[in-house]
Design a protein with these regions (language model features):
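Non-catalytic, C-terminal membrane-associated alpha-helical segments of glycosyltransferases
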Residues: 200-203, 224-288
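Conserved donor NDP-sugar-binding/catalytic core segment of glycosyltransferases
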Residues: 62, 66-107
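Active-site donor/metal-binding and catalytic loop motifs
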Residues: 175, 179-225
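Glycine-rich, basic loop-to-helix element that forms the pyrophosphate-binding segment
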Residues: 33-49
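Short aromatic/hydrophobic "clamp" motif used to bind/position activated sugar donors
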Residues: 54
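Short, well-formed alpha-helical segments that are part of the catalytic scaffolds
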Residues: 1, 5-20
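Donor nucleotide-sugar recognition loop
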Residues: 135-136, 145, 149-171, 178-187
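A recurrent flexible, glycine/aromatic-enriched loop bordering the glycosyltransferase active site
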Residues: 119-143
Length: 288
């Protein structure tokens, strides 16, 4: 893991020792001084690791299922298996988004700690042990060494702390099948940061992958792709408002969406959401 909190890294190591259920090596990269980007950190740690199955994990994660190491290892051993994680999407559109599109594309099996509560997130509509996906969130990623070595994390395009997970899992998905694991539960204790840097990185990611997108975990009719395009546009507008990023998606973007889709339920929800999120942002700014 990439560590800026030695106490958190020790808690994670203790948790892994109690739950993994198979031989492992724990590498904590002390990043407090250098502040190296995650692509560089993960490539260095993977190159130094002794085993052939790798886990790139945030230090603010807790494994809650005993024996998870054997469950993951058995799936990774399949020749066509790429990356395994705990939250992902069945498609990645050309339209600017994060790692999912705000609709039925989400596949997830983890607990998110936020606002003082533990919130289980379980999206497994097919009822399978491992859900095929294209992209994965980077809180915890498992991959075979040979798959990592064919792809590597892109240190040049993503030198900081965003985009590495989507880029890496898209690259692996070009040759292998990625999965969300529904047999192991983990808890994630942070929700990520959505800033101007995050937005710039997502735009850089989309420029890099423009000629390959959209990508799908399974064949999808054009009508379904068009539906996700509409859903994801509305979702991203609301998401940017929720995170206070009105500089990226403002009131005008919402009005343009409503003008194009006046009868859509997604349109009707935009105005009240804008009022709520804008007022919250104003109050937050006043407290500073």
């Amino acid at each position: 893991c990439c560590s800026v909190d030695p106490a958190a890294a020790r808690r994670l190591e203790k948790n892994i020792a109690a739950t993994c259920g198979c031989p492992y090596e724990f590498i904590a990269y002390d990043n407090r001084i250098n502040g190296d980007g995650l692509c560089k950190v993960f490539n260095r740690c993977a190159a130094a690791a002794r085993y052939d199955m790798l886990c790139f994990v945030h230090e603010d994660v807790e494994f809650q299922t005993e024996g998870w190491g054997q469950i993951i290892a058995a799936k990774l051993a399949e020749a066509d298996c790429g990356v395994i994680g705990f939250a992902g999407s069945i498609l990645k559109l050309k339209r600017l988004t994060g790692w999912h599109n705000g609709g039925g594309d989400l596949r997830a099996h983890y607990v998110q700690y936020m606002r003082g509560g533990h919130h289980p997130i379980d999206r497994n509509p097919d009822g399978v042990d491992f859900s095929p996906v294209v992209t994965l969130d980077g809180m915890c990623l498992f991959v075979r060494r040979e798959v990592w070595s064919e792809t590597l994390f892109d240190e040049q395009t993503f030198p900081r702390f965003h985009g590495y997970d989507i880029d890496f899992t898209l690259a692996v998905a070009c040759r292998y099948r990625n999965y969300v694991c529904n047999k192991v539960f983990i808890e994630h204790f942070s929700t990520g940061g959505y800033t101007r840097e995050w937005i710039r990185t997502m735009k850089r990611l989309h420029r890099k992958w423009h000629d390959r997108l959209p990508m799908f975990a399974m064949p999808m009719p054009q009508s379904e792709i068009d539906r996700y395009e509409r859903i994801s546009e509305s979702y991203f507008i609301r998401f940017m408002w929720q995170k206070g990023c009105f500089f990226e998606r403002g009131f005008g973007h919402g009005m343009q969406y409503i003008a194009r889709y006046p009868l859509s339920g997604a349109s009707w929800i935009l105005l009240p959401k804008y009022v709520v999120y804008k007022l919250r942002d104003i109050l937050k700014q006043k407290k500073k």
